[in-house]
Amino acid sequence: LLISAVQLQNLQASGRPLMVFDCSFDLAQPSAGMAQYQEAHIPGAIYADLDQHLSARPGDPAASGGRHPLPSREAFAAWLRSVGFNNAMQAVVYDRQGVNYCGRLWWMLKWAGHEAVAVLDGGLPVWQAAGGAVQSGGGPVPTAPGDFALQTPLRRLVSVDTVQAQLGSAAQTIVDARAPVRFRGEVEPLDPVAGHIPGA
């Protein structure tokens, strides 16, 4: 699940097939993630934008609802191929926000059936503190599309109906990863209703 900065540096030096994804994002300022990426990212990292790459676009088939609906598995796989990703690659995901956004890509890769994916422990701040190299500017341009093919999902997508039907059941655990003030309903900058799902 986690890879340390030193382990990633060793993996880079090994020459094994690897793709690193920068998932930096800011819900309040959607363009801020790309600006952060262009300012500094791990050399060779692909930028994975929550709105553009990790969510269904308006009018496209979606696998879920919500503010950032999941794209279909097929659309997600097409994006992975477009950035040169292959089934043989180790994926490493990171962000600058405490894994808020790279955790989504980790889950989506598992949902696409890809086993070899890890979260960079501590994200870019820890990478830099460990002496990891960074570069600025745009990302790499793939020399050829990847051949990523969907596999049997390693993670399950659960519907809202299923969650509602199992509220209060010991068989279901809901984890709310938002800020404590949003969980308690004291502040809600994005959603029309404040608070959390009962039992979370």
Predicted features by range, described:
Residues 1-199:
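Cytosolic catalytic domains that perform sulfur/thiol-centered chemistry
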